[in-house]
Amino acid sequence: MKTIPWEVDASKLSNAYIAGFLDGDGSIMATVEKRPDRRRFPYRIRLRVNFTQHERHRKLIEIIQKFLGGVGAVRREKSHQLVELVIQDRYSVEQVLKRLLPYIVLKERQAKIMLEILEMYRKATVNTRSSVTEKEYVNILMLVQKIRNLNSRTGGKVNLEVFNPVTTLRKKTKELSQRNKG
């Protein structure tokens, strides 16, 4: 089978190739969203792994999705003519990162931190419901800030604020991390 230079023969894909693709045209992101409902913690943590390409390479993104076990969703971003494979289910994110971690070079620190966050959530899960303590929640937010600092686009320019759900005091994560060190 003759391929166009940017096409990939699916039989030649490997974990190393996909990890290189993630390093170059992917992202490992942790975002914090304010919860509209009144839950115990005012923010929801979203963990995400993306693979992005120009829309003319949609087939490659679909091949990667299939190689990774059909996880995530392929989405089209019309305004920039992009397609992306978005993986945000925690279990799928964890499985993909564990599978690719030995081969990730540039985003290795983000991957390790995200796996640490996922481990904290898994340990705190009881009957499919998260039972994260307040201290674990603050630690997770600090790890999210580390990922944000490592990602060049966010650059950690905006510090996350941690709200104490009991007293509603605002404390910047830098202050919290200094207390945890000392």
Q: Model-flagged regions — what are they?
A:
Residues 1-182:
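Sequence-level preference for short, compositionally simple segments enriched
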